[in-house]
Amino acid sequence: MTFLTRTLSALLIVVSAHVFAQTNLVTNLPKTEYGYPDFQGYWENLHQTPLQRPEELGDRQAYSEEEAFALIEQASASLQKRSLPLDPDREPPQEGRVTNQADDDFDDFPIDIAMINGEYRTSLIIDPPNGRIPHDIVNRAQTNEFYFYLEDNNLRFDGPEAAYGGERCLFPGPQLSMMYQRGLSPYTQIVQTKDYLMILGEYPYHARIIRIESDHPAIGFAKWMGDSVGHWENQTLVIHTEKIRREQSFPPIFSTVNTQITERLSLGENGTLVYEYTVTDPELYLQSFTAQIPFTRMHNGQVIYEYACHEGNYSFVGSLAGARWEDAQSEIDNDAN
């Protein structure tokens, strides 16, 4: 190991231990002009902790300090290897293999382990105790009910309304932008007033507006990201979301229009934000499940940028035109018979 590698690894371990070690809730909180905890600003959740716990870890909610540091150093070494110049005469990668090298993957490469309440978490999910999503195996075929309905009835290209949310680059997942890190961007901006909280994710780039101390409409309809209302419980903002459009059912967290999501936002020590959510849907899950994610403030001067994705928008006109051509050919063939 070179001096640079040793130095970088040691620095990463120290920074990781410091940044993620203190997420206990505190009483001396920054407040807005209205007297509520101030969540405003730019946040990031750069860590390698997976949403679901590896099955071999069972009910182990946390790594030991030694295990966590070993994982951080391993990720640091991979990050350094990824940054090295590539051999122009190298063989092509094995079919289906993702190497995380610059020529085939530009996702973020986080190295930290998420830490909450002094624990290096093995997964974001903390309940059930095994850290896994409790899918109802009997109903797995219904987890993408919208997609399968279109496929089974040959409606996939009837019109733009029949397109999958991710296909049109509208919502590539998750249902709510802070629920788990989605490859390209773990960055979020929060803007807050007395009556509203706005959460803007960089990827996908959508503004979610939450009404505070309000109610869901008596007769509502499904919307992108659902309908969200919040209320204060001491220093915690509790947000309830319902009526999420069925086009937003993506793995690993599937949803229906009846899915309920309850989020809890609280400020922790050292300027951290503790984000917790619980997903409930008896149609899909054997029980509710809960995840916790620590966010830290982005460095001064860092902001988020619009992520523009057009593959499923401009190109979709061609997809529909091709489908209409196939329809016409089918009619010609039927007339010929």
Regions found by a protein language model. Name each.
Residues Q22-N337:
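PEST-like low-complexity, intrinsically disordered acidic/proline/serine-rich tracts
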